[in-house]
A protein has these predicted regions:
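N-terminal cap/lid segment of alpha/beta-hydrolase-fold proteins
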Residues: 23-81
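Short beta-strand element of the alpha/beta-hydrolase
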Residues: 83-92
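Active-site glycine-rich loops that stabilize anionic/oxyanionic intermediates
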Residues: 91-96, 257
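Cap/lid segment of the alpha/beta-hydrolase catalytic domain
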Residues: 94-103, 120-146, 188-192, 196, ...
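Short amphipathic alpha-helix adjacent to the substrate-entry channel of hydrolases
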Residues: 101-119
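Primarily recognizes the serine-hydrolase "nucleophile elbow" in alpha/beta-hydrolase
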Residues: 149-236, 240, 246
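Short beta-strand/loop motif that positions the catalytic acidic residue
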Residues: 253-255, 259
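C-terminal catalytic histidine-bearing segment of alpha/beta-hydrolase fold enzymes
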Residues: 264, 268-322
């Protein structure tokens, strides 16, 4: 059966109640977007506005997706050889919006060109994870991280239907950028139990990623909100809600030293915790690069990071090495 027809059949069979929001984000033609929750979304928060796609604003050079209340996943099948490997993509946006192209579809284009199935998760925003309240100069930590629920659910669905979707249930990883990098760490350390009441058989499947990639992650360093004098005297402690163990999946980290949104301490704190726990971890730090560069080409050395990731994937995930 043709790959697209296979995904379409699975979508109709499993998510017959799906209907796209007229003004919300839609994938390009040929890609199937599916709701991940068959009925009511757990811990749903009423949104005063419908989902929308906004134009770039300020210094941002990419559009944003706002007010997501019905999370979805979109499949991007491999171009050419199917390695069986799958990567779920978590776009960034500070848990306030989603950078669905810069840190979403463009990432999927790169992954699928390397024989990897890509699943782009449109998780709930805003307020679905830790976020910075600029008006009141404070970081807000919601009681329930609904983005984590969406990530756990997606990994369970992929494993439940791995045979139908031609993916290896033991080669499912995650990649996230900025707030999405925090979501990578969250789902990598919160897989023993679901953070929502189980819905169906998919929630009996493991939601542990087999490998993880966090690119300029945020909300990981325990001391990021302290004053400068205190921060300079503190250690690289990880936030207590990110509990690294020896079972945390192998991880790839990347950050720039001049990142003025999420300081380099974010990756350093996570690296130290992973290293102490004996988790295989590779970290790349560059002097320059800033924040929010995605995979777009540039003149700085950090623009070559996808090559480093490709090498790491080839040595970490069996079957990817050409």
């Amino acid at each position: 059966m043709h790959k697209f027809n296979l995904f379409l059949f699975a979508a109709v069979l499993l998510f017959a109640n799906f209907s796209a929001q007229a003004d919300g984000w839609r994938p390009a033609s040929g890609h199937e977007q599916m709701q991940i929750w068959p009925g009511a979304v757990p811990d749903a928060i009423p949104r005063p506005k419908p989902e929308s796609v906004g134009p770039p604003s300020g210094r941002e050079w990419w559009p944003r997706v706002n007010d997501v209340s019905r999370p979805t996943m979109t499949f991007y099948v491999p171009k050419g050889r199917n390695t069986g490997v799958t990567v779920v993509v978590f776009p960034g946006g500070g848990y306030r919006f989603l950078a669905m192209d810069l840190e979403g579809t463009e990432v999927c284009d790169w992954l699928t060109s390397r024989g990897i199935t890509c699943v782009l998760l449109k998780y709930r925003v805003p307020g679905s994870g830790p976020w910075w309240d600029g008006e009141n100069r404070r970081r807000v930590y919601p009681k329930v991280q609904t983005a984590l629920q969406d990530a756990q659910r997606t990994l369970g669905l992929l494993r439940q239907h791995a045979a139908q979707w031609h993916i290896d249930p033991h080669k499912i990883g995650v990649i996230g950028f900025s707030a999405g990098g925090h979501l990578v760490a969250a789902v990598s350390t919160h897989f023993a139990h679901r953070t929502y009441p189980p819905v169906d058989a998919a929630d009996r499947e493991s939601c542990r990623p087999d490998f993880a990639i966090a690119i300029y992650p945020g909300h990981l360093w325990a001391h990021e909100d302290e004053d400068r004098a205190t921060r300079d005297e503190t250690h690289l402690d990880l936030r207590p809600d990110i509990r690294v163990t020896a079972d945390t999946p192998p991880t790839f980290l990347l950050q720039a030293g001049d990142d003025d949104v999420d300081g380099v301490e974010q990756s350093l704190a996570y690296y130290v915790a992973l290293h102490k726990a004996g988790v295989p971890v590779e970290m790349h730090l560059y002097a320059q690069g800033g924040h929010g560069f995605g995979l777009r080409p540039g003149k700085l050395p950090i623009a070559q990071w996808p090559q480093l990731l490709e090498t790491w994937l080839g040595t970490t995930v069996t079957g990817l090495k050409q």
